[in-house]
């Protein structure tokens, strides 16, 4: 993608970021939930939620199974941990508890550390059902949340209005989703993401790979494209990433994606208008917040991966990336007060 095109879309993504302002109260700059954390996996929900906090969210909640929660609570006092996915509780008790927590969130990230056992998959399905009925709830799906989508694709389909959902599959997860939806995965790689997004009800997809392909299956509106661009139904992020493929990098992506989706959605609702950041006047921008969030998060995640690899080489682990989120955020999006690059909307 030409640098002019990349700069234009990134400036639009930057426009979603709320200012740091004394008139904003705690929680208005992002209340993010991560549904995951099971008997076998406690690291992934930590990386996703702490990545979201380091990226700029005000609050991060982890919704998990009790044994995972006991461990996650020791990782950081900054996280709010809800151990409500208890296999000893009834489905209705879990639904009620989940509804109470989710009603406080802007975005729910489903999948980090979720696992594939029947109980945790059932909890994820309940969360999808609740989110679909919450008009202002955004959803990001990763890891074993995608396993549920593969087996029950209807959980991400038929959302009212503009689908407020972003999927972040890696190569194998993407192939399995294509198989489920009967899409020939041997076609041109830039055509597959739009096909899958269309089949899944126009959910936005980040198809992770050597470059990241982003699509909701629809034509990209001209407002998102530079003058030199041809008509297309996908965006491609070619920003260089790191060479170390370490477990947990996708959790950093899901966290940053969730924050940008929350910021963009609140921007459109006018939450930041009283601090000099009015909602976009262009309807095409307002209707493509998930696409812009995906593009900004992909650019950020590839950059933090590159910086981590440059610093640590083969020894790089995801904990190194969490520590670098703040500085790479400023590299990609600018420091507070250095926002002259916002898109003109």
From Swiss-Prot:
The keyword Transport does not apply. Residues 9-332 form the YjeF C-terminal domain. Its EC number is 4.2.1.93. Keywords: ATP-binding, Cytoplasm, Lyase, NAD, NADP, Nucleotide-binding, Phosphoprotein. It is an enzyme of class 4 (lyase). It catalyses: (6S)-NADHX + ATP = ADP + phosphate + NADH + H(+); (6S)-NADPHX + ATP = ADP + phosphate + NADPH + H(+). Its cofactor is Mg(2+). GO terms for cellular component: cytoplasm. GO terms for biological process: metabolite repair; nicotinamide nucleotide metabolic process. ATP binds at residues 208-212, 241-250. SUPFAM superfamilies: Ribokinase-like (SSF53613). GO terms for molecular function: ATP binding; ATP-dependent NAD(P)H-hydrate dehydratase activity. The keyword rRNA processing does not apply. It is found in: Cytoplasm. (6S)-NADPHX binds at residues 113, 170-176, 251. Catalyzes the dehydration of the S-form of NAD(P)HX at the expense of ATP, which is converted to ADP. Together with NAD(P)HX epimerase, which catalyzes the epimerization of the S- and R-forms, the enzyme allows the repair of both epimers of NAD(P)HX, a damaged form of NAD(P)H that is a result of enzymatic or heat-dependent hydration. Belongs to the NnrD/CARKD family. This is ATP-dependent (S)-NAD(P)H-hydrate dehydratase.
